[in-house]
């Protein structure tokens, strides 16, 4: 039974990888004498720098790749915003001077954690980047905001929400670049942001509000339209609770596989991946009466289970059948949002922790609120309340990228088409809104490009049906530093061990799609980026 969704499995619940070791200080690069940075609107409380030897785990996580040990200067800058009474920690890791590549990389968070720290900072430092992460002054708990969302009087803590939503990412850029310059005695040649999920949202917010912070921003699977996205994660739970039907993950997996089988060929090649989502129509009721093997036993799909699967696939709707948010993409897993559990023989909902924290703390303003009481009729009201109260501060979906265009900064985004948590339609919707606002696709391509990855899960972590992008940051660096605007992004599908490549693909620049030309379907060379998939029946 999966109790914590995939999103949390990629996040360290505590930064515990590191062990300190004393090292000789080289040349004039004194880790203990970092100059306090100047942060507008904030007071620096402390700057503590120590030489450390840290163990870096590979990212994405891989059981076959060993950890690596590197020496760094580790600097913690603690600051407080004027009149807020918060305490924000920005952690900066600096490779020793002979290992520095001359670049700075800020790293993003995931879930309710503003920073993932070691998880992303370690690999960045290993590549030679000076790198930073921030806790935004909130608890480093990716699963919940319950401990900080509300003030003692029961009202929303808008100061900390603003930290989490945008302010602390900007602060991290200022602090990280200043500490980098203080240590190496010269500024970074180029600065980058790297994040996925909430980290992707952070990157999009930087592009919208503070584009001068970075030369390049990589935003994977961005959790933009944050109020709508988080509210929508409760929909599968409302469906199961309302219908009093709680299909097992094995039954849900049968529906997922049937959806892939129904739509796989629409892109011209049968490869276990749905690339043509727009042309895909899947009828869950076709499975009624079919037997599926679940462990040692077989079970028969019921009409009630198919009805639940259909309602979840169709996405949140009002009682008048008005769409409130996006549908679950065919091929995406139900695991994560449609979990249930059994207590004393009785099936119960098991809500997605990140979304349930949103509803409890920010919408209901009651950390003890019982989510099982939410009905179909409640959903439109929750969506509207979410937008009304929080879109301005946390939406991350402003299509006006005038400042980004003017800054010269490049924004590179990608999204898995089988993202089970943050559905890819949000990224497509946002890109279309930007095109409408900023003068069309070819104009926007000068500074913002989107790549879609068929069959790829949330942030590409774990086993994917499709090919997940690799070397995404290198693609961005080439665009920023050499002017090589990407038409494609390399991607690979691997086995569960992560060591064997099953097939390769080139992800296409939106709105182009991968059209099969013929030949070995496991080779990226057998596909071309085209305006459509061609005619297939």
UniProtKB/Swiss-Prot annotation:
Reaction catalysed by this enzyme: feruloyl-polysaccharide + H2O = ferulate + polysaccharide
Gene3D superfamilies with a match to the protein in the record: alpha/beta hydrolase
Keyword hit for Calcium: yes
GO molecular function: feruloyl esterase activity; metal ion binding
Keyword Calcium recorded: yes
Localization annotation: Secreted
One GO term of the biological process aspect: xylan catabolic process
Annotated signal sequence range: 1-22
EC number: 3.1.1.73
Entry protein name: Probable feruloyl esterase ARB_07085
């Amino acid at each position: 039974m999966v109790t914590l969704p995939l999103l949390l499995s990629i996040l360290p619940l505590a930064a515990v990888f590191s062990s300190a070791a004393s090292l000789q200080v080289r040349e004039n690069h004194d880790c203990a004498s970092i100059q306090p940075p100047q942060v507008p609107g904030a007071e620096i409380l402390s700057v503590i720098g120590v030489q450390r030897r840290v163990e870096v785990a590979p990212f994405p996580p891989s059981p076959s790749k060993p950890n690596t040990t590197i020496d760094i200067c580790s600097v913690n800058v603690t600051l407080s915003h004027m009149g807020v009474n918060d305490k924000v920690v920005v952690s900066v890791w600096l490779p020793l001077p002979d290992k520095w590549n001359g670049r700075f990389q800020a790293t993003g968070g995931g879930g309710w954690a503003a920073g993932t720290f070691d998880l992303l900072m370690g690999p960045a430092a290993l590549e030679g980047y000076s790198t930073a992460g921030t806790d935004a002054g909130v608890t480093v708990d990716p699963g919940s905001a319950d401990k900080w969302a509300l003030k003692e009087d029961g009202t929303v803590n808008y100061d900390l929400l603003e930290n989490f939503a945008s302010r602390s990412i900007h602060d991290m850029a200022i602090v990280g670049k200043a500490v980098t310059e203080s240590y190496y005695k010269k500024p970074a040649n180029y600065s980058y942001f790297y994040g996925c999920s909430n980290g992707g949202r952070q990157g999009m917010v930087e592009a919208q509000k503070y584009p001068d912070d970075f030369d390049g921003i990589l935003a994977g699977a961005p959790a933009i339209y944050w109020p709508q996205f988080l509210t929508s994660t409760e929909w599968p739970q409302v469906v199961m609770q309302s219908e009093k039907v709680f299909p097992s993950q094995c039954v849900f997996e049968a529906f997922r596989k049937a959806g892939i089988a129904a739509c796989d060929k629409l892109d011209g090649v049968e490869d276990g991946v749905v690339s043509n989502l727009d042309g895909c129509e899947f009828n869950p009721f076709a499975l009624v009466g079919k037997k599926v093997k679940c462990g040692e036993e077989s079970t028969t799909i019921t009409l009630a289970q198919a009805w639940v699967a259909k309602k979840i696939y169709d996405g949140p709707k009002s009682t008048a059948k008005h769409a409130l948010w996006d549908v679950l993409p065919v091929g995406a897993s139900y695991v994560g949002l449609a979990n249930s559990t059994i207590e004393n023989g009785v099936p119960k909902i098991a809500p997605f922790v990140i979304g349930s924290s949103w509803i409890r703390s920010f919408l209901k303003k009651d950390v003890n609120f019982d989510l099982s009481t939410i009905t179909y009729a409640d959903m439109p009201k929750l969506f509207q309340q979410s937008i009304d109260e929080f879109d301005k501060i946390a939406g991350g979906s402003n299509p006006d990228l005038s400042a980004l265009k003017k800054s010269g900064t490049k924004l590179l985004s990608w999204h898995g088409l089988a993202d089970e948590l943050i559905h890819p339609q949000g990224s497509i919707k946002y890109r279309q809104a930007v095109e409408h606002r900023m003068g069309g696709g070819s104009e926007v391509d000068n500074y913002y490009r989107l790549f879609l990855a068929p069959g790829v899960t949330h942030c590409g972590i774990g086993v994917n049906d499709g090919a997940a992008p690799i070397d995404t940051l290198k693609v961005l660096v080439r665009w920023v530093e050499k002017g090589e605007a990407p038409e494609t992004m390399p991607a690979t599908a691997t086995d569960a061990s992560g060591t064997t490549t099953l097939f390769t693909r080139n992800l296409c620049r939106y709105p182009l799609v991968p059209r099969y030309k013929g030949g070995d379907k496991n080779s990226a060379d057998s596909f071309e980026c085209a305006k459509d998939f061609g005619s297939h029946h």
